C-alpha cells in the first residue's frame, strides 16, 4: 500500500481507468456518501483515493467500494474512523408491497318490486320506469288497448296486480332482469289453471340435487304454494312462486356459468371476467323447451375434468371421526431410524391413503403396523406412496409427506373437490382442441391436444408473496435468446439495495440501464438517491446470455400482469417438492419441448433459433393458456384425484367467501 497520498496526475489516470472499467462506480460512491451525510455542508478539500498496488508498484484497477476515501482535513488517526462504509439501512427507500386479499363482498339482495298499477283510474297507465331505471315496455298498453273482452282485461288487470304484491328478493342484477322480463311478458310462467306446472316441479327436483355439483341446493329451491289457499290468495301465492322461481333460475344460470363466488372479489391475483349471458333469451328457451333439464345441465361445465371431479365427489365416503391420529408437525423419520411416531404414520396410511395405493400395499402396512424401526419393506412402501402422491420418493417421512394425509381427510378432500369444480366454472367451459394448462398448486404444466396430454412437466411458480395470477390468455409469441426487462417491483425491492452496496453488480450480471424515456444511460448519470426514495426513474434490462434469468427462451401471451413462461439457468429448483419460488412468472422444466409444442414443430427444428441473437417467432394460430389453481385435480388416464397443498391460501379465501355468500342468501330462504 502507498503510505502517502498519490499525486493528482496519477489519481487522474487511476480514476479514469476505474470509470472506464465500471462507469457506475465513482458516481455511486459519491451518491452514497451524500445519502449518509458523511460529509458536512461546509466546503472541504477534495478527497483523494488510496489504491492498492501490485508487486511492481503499478496501480490496480478495482471496485471503488474497496477504495479508501481520505479527507485531508482529518488527522491520520481519525481517517479510518471517518471512512466507514455507508449504512444502507439508513437510506430512505421506497418499496412496492405485494397485493393483499380483498374483504369479499357477496352481491347483496334487494326486493323485487314491481311498479304499482291502477287500471281503473288510468286505463293502462303505469310508471315510466322500474326502480332499477329499466324502461317499461309498451306491451301493457298494447294488451289493454286491444279488442280483448272485458274478461280478458280483468284477468290481465288481476295478474299485474298480483305481481305488484310480490314479496321476493334477489341479487340486484337479477332483480332488475326479472322485473324487465315480466314487463315484456305479463303472464305467469310456472302455473296454469291455478296449479304449478310439471316443468316447474322438474326444475325444482333438478335443483335439489345440485350438491352433486358442489353447489348449495337451498340457493335455488322455492317453497311450493300452500295447497290450502284459494281464490285471490291462491293466485297471489302462485304469482309470488312464479317470480321467485324465475329469479332462482336466473341465479342458477349465473352460478353454473360463472361460479357462485365472484372470483375477482377474492384478491388482486384473480383476473377472471364473468361470461356475458342473455338471461331473457335463456329464460324463454327454458320456458318453451320440451327438454328443460338438458338445458339446465348445459350451463355447467361438461369437460372430462369437471365430470371426473363430480364422480369423485359422489364416491367420497362419509367423514370418519374415529381416526383422530395426530403427528407432530415437524416430525422427520429417515430410513434406518427408530421413531415412536412411525406407527402413527402407518396407521394414517391405512386410514386415509387413496384406495389405489392401498390395493397394493395394505397387506404389508397391516403386517408392519406398530413397528417403530423404519427399514426394509416399510421404506419401499413409503417410497411408493410418495410416488403415488407426486412427492420426492426419498423414503423420508417429513412434513410434506405427512401433510398429504393429515391435511387430506375426507372433509378436506370434499372441500378441495368442490373448490376445484367452482374454479372450473370461472373458466371457459371449453378449453379448446389444444391448450397449455398450468396448475399452480400442483407445480405442473401440461400441453394438451385433442384431449390427449402430449407434455407434462414440473414448473416453478410465484412465491406466496409474489403469486402467479389466476387468469387465461392466448400464447402468441416465442422469443429465443431473450433479454429480460426487470419488473419494477424487483428493481425497487431487491436490486436497489444490491446496487447501492455493490457498485459492480449491474455490470457483472450483464444489466443495461435506461432512463424514464427509455434512453440508455450510464449508472454514473443516475440520481440513485432519488430513485431509491421514489422507486421510479429507471428501468433495467438484462442482456441475453447463459446467466440471463429467462434462460434461452420465453413463451409470451401479452397481458397486464407481465406473466409469461420461460426457461431458467437455475435447474435445481425443479428437484424440490415446494416450487412456489419465483416472482410470478412460470419457469418450465422442459422449455424447448413446450416451445416446440405451441409452435407445432419438432424440438430439433428449434436449433437454428438458438444460434445467435434475440429472435421472436409468432404462432400461426394462438394457443390458449390457462394459469389455474386447483388443489384437487384428476389424472384423466387413471381417474384418480390428486390433492395439493393450498400454498397461496386461496382455499381459505374461498371458505370465507362461501360463508359470507351463505349468510346473504339464507336471509331470503
Walk through the language-model features, giving the residues of each.
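Bacterial N-terminal signal peptides that target proteins for export
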Residues: 2-13
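Well-ordered beta-sheet/strand-loop patches within structured domains
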Residues: 2, 34, 38, 45, ...
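Signal peptide processing junction and immediate N-terminal pro/mature segment
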Residues: 21-41
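Flexible, low-complexity segments enriched for small/polar residues
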Residues: 154, 162-229
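Bacterial N-terminal signal peptides
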Residues: 11-23
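Conserved, well-structured beta-alpha core segment at the onset of a catalytic domain
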Residues: 25-28, 229, 451, 455
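Mature extracellular/secreted ectodomains of secretory-pathway proteins
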Residues: 208-274
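Amphipathic alpha-helical segments that form the core helices of the histone-fold
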Residues: 200-203, 226-232, 236, 379-386
Amino acid at each position: 500500500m502507498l503510505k502517502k497520498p498519490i499525486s493528482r496526475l496519477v489519481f487522474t489516470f487511476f480514476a479514469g481507468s476505474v470509470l472506464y472499467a465500471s462507469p457506475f462506480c465513482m458516481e455511486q460512491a459519491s451518491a452514497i456518501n451524500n445519502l449518509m451525510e458523511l460529509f458536512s455542508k461546509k466546503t472541504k478539500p477534495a478527497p483523494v483515493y488510496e489504491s492498492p498496488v501490485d508487486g511492481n508498484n503499478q496501480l490496480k484497477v478495482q471496485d471503488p467500494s474497496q477504495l479508501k476515501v481520505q479527507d485531508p482535513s482529518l488527522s491520520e488517526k481519525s481517517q479510518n474512523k471517518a471512512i466507514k462504509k455507508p449504512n444502507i439501512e439508513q437510506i430512505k427507500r421506497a418499496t412496492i408491497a405485494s397485493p393483499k386479499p380483498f374483504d369479499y363482498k357477496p352481491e347483496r339482495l334487494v326486493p323485487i318490486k314491481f311498479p304499482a298499477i291502477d287500471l281503473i283510474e288510468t286505463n293502462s297507465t303505469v310508471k315510466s320506469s322500474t326502480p332499477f331505471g329499466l324502461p317499461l315496455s309498451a306491451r301493457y298498453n298494447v294488451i289493454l288497448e286491444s279488442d280483448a273482452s272485458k274478461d280478458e282485461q280483468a284477468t290481465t288487470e288481476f295478474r299485474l296486480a298480483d305481481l305488484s304484491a310480490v314479496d321476493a328478493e334477489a341479487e340486484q342484477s337479477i332483480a332488475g332482469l326479472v322485473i324487465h322480463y315480466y314487463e315484456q311478458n305479463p303472464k305467469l310462467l310456472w302455473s296454469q289453471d291455478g296449479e304449478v306446472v310439471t316443468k316447474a316441479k322438474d326444475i325444482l327436483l333438478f335443483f335439489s340435487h345440485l350438491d352433486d355439483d358442489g353447489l348449495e341446493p337451498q340457493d335455488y329451491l322455492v317453497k311450493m304454494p300452500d295447497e290450502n289457499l284459494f281464490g285471490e290468495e291462491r293466485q297471489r301465492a302462485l304469482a309470488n312462486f312464479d317470480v321467485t322461481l324465475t329469479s332462482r333460475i336466473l341465479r342458477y344460470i349465473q352460478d353454473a356459468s360463472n361460479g357462485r363466488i365472484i372470483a375477482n372479489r377474492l384478491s388482486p391475483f384473480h383476473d377472471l371476467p364473468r361470461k356475458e349471458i342473455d338471461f331473457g333469451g335463456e329464460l324463454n328457451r327454458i320456458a318453451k323447451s320440451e327438454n328443460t333439464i338438458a338445458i339446465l345441465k348445459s350451463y355447467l361445465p361438461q369437460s372430462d375434468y369437471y365430470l371426473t371431479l363430480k364422480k369423485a365427489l359422489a364416491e367420497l365416503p362419509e367423514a370418519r371421526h374415529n381416526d383422530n391420529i395426530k403427528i407432530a408437525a415437524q416430525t422427520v423419520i429417515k430410513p434406518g431410524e427408530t421413531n415412536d411416531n412411525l406407527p402413527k404414520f402407518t396407521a394414517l396410511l391405512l386410514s386415509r391413503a387413496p384406495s389405489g395405493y392401498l390395493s397394493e400395499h395394505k397387506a404389508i402396512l397391516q403386517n408392519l403396523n406398530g413397528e417403530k424401526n423404519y427399514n426394509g419393506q416399510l421404506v419401499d412402501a413409503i417410497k411408493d406412496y410418495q410416488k403415488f402422491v407426486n412427492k420426492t420418493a426419498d423414503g423420508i417421512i417429513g412434513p410434506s409427506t405427512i401433510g398429504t394425509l393429515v391435511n387430506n381427510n375426507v372433509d378436506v378432500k370434499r372441500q378441495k373437490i368442490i373448490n376445484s369444480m367452482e374454479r372450473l366454472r370461472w373458466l371457459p367451459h371449453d378449453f379448446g382442441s389444444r391448450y397449455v394448462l398450468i396448475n399452480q398448486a400442483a407445480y405442473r404444466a401440461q400441453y394438451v391436444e385433442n384431449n390427449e396430454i402430449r407434455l407434462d412437466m414440473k414448473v416453478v411458480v410465484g412465491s406466496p408473496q409474489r403469486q402467479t395470477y389466476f387468469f387465461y390468455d392466448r400464447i402468441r409469441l416465442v422469443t429465443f435468446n431473450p433479454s429480460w426487462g426487470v419488473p419494477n417491483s424487483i428493481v425497487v425491492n431487491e436490486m436497489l439495495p444490491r446496487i447501492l452496496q455493490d457498485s459492480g453488480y449491474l455490470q457483472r450480471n450483464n444489466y443495461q440501464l435506461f432512463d424514464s424515456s427509455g434512453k440508455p444511460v450510464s449508472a454514473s448519470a443516475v440520481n440513485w438517491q432519488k430513485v431509491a426514495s421514489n422507486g421510479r426513474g429507471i428501468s433495467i434490462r438484462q442482456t441475453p446470455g447463459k446467466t440471463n434469468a429467462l434462460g434461452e427462451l420465453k413463451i409470451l401471451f401479452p397481458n397486464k400482469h407481465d406473466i409469461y413462461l420461460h426457461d431458467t439457468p437455475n435447474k435445481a429448483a425443479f428437484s424440490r417438492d415446494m416450487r412456489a419460488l419465483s416472482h410470478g412468472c412460470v419457469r418450465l422444466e422442459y422449455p424447448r419441448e413446450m416451445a416446440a409444442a405451441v409452435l407445432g414443430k419438432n424440438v430439433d427444428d428449434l436449433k437454428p433459433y438458438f444460434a445467435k441473437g434475440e429472435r421472436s417467432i409468432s404462432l400461426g394460430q394462438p394457443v390458449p393458456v390457462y394459469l389455474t389453481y386447483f388443489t384437487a385435480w384428476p389424472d384423466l388416464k387413471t381417474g384418480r384425484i390428486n390433492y395439493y397443498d393450498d400454498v397461496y391460501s386461496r382455499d381459505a379465501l374461498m371458505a370465507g367467501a362461501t360463508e359470507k355468500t351463505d349468510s346473504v342468501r339464507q336471509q331470503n330462504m
